[in-house]
A protein has these predicted regions:
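N-terminal catalytic cores of secreted or lumenal carbohydrate-active enzymes
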Residues: 1-100, 104, 120, 124, ...
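Active-site neighborhood of glycoside hydrolase catalytic domains
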Residues: 78-101, 108-174
Length: 174
């Protein structure tokens, strides 16, 4: 909130700037492109998150942890999954757009996600990834969404394989 180091193109506002407060008119440019794509006939949409909202992070920033380690607070795995599912349900209910896939994990092992970065991003270690994927599936189901849960979307194949090896059966089913 008081951090001003994100570049203009990367300063994407989240829909929940603080716990309990939703602001649905944020990120107008990307919303416009999304809905225009649908109008033009695109029929597959995947939602993704670069980072949890700042208040769900250990560092208080969407750019990463001060040491480049995991930045999602353990007590926020469920709330972050609920956040993602609420956004997906909002698009279904208010815009008539259903996401076919959702990934809560964009480059979750990137060693460049450090506090003060010019772009949002979040390290999420493999064990925590599995919990988040499972929680996201449950949150989507609770809202009647059939959206698939995907991830991790790592920068290197070796990172993806490392993450997948740590997933439990529940994460694989999600």
């Amino acid at each position: 909130p008081e951090h001003h180091f994100l570049s203009h193109r990367a300063a994407v506002e989240g829909y929940q700037p603080e716990p309990g407060k939703w602001v649905w008119d944020r990120d107008a440019g990307q919303r416009k492109v999304l809905l225009e794509c649908r109008r033009m006939g695109v029929d597959f949409f995947e939602a993704f998150a670069n980072s949890p909202p700042w208040w769900m992070t250990k560092s208080g920033s969407v750019t990463g942890d001060k040491d480049g380690r995991g930045n999602l607070r353990d007590d926020m795995i469920g709330p972050f999954a609920d956040y993602l599912a609420t956004v997906a349900a909002h698009y279904r209910d208010k815009a008539g757009l259903t996401f076919q896939a959702l990934t809560p994990l964009n480059e979750p092992l990137g060693d460049w996600w450090k506090f003060g970065n010019k772009q949002e991003g979040c390290v999420i270690p493999p064990g925590q990834q599995a919990k988040l994927i499972t929680a996201t599936r449950k949150a989507l189901d609770a809202r009647g969404l059939t959206t698939g849960v995907t991830g991790p979307e790592d920068n290197r194949t070796s990172q993806t394989l490392n993450s997948l090896a740590a997933y439990d059966a529940a994460a694989w089913r999600a």
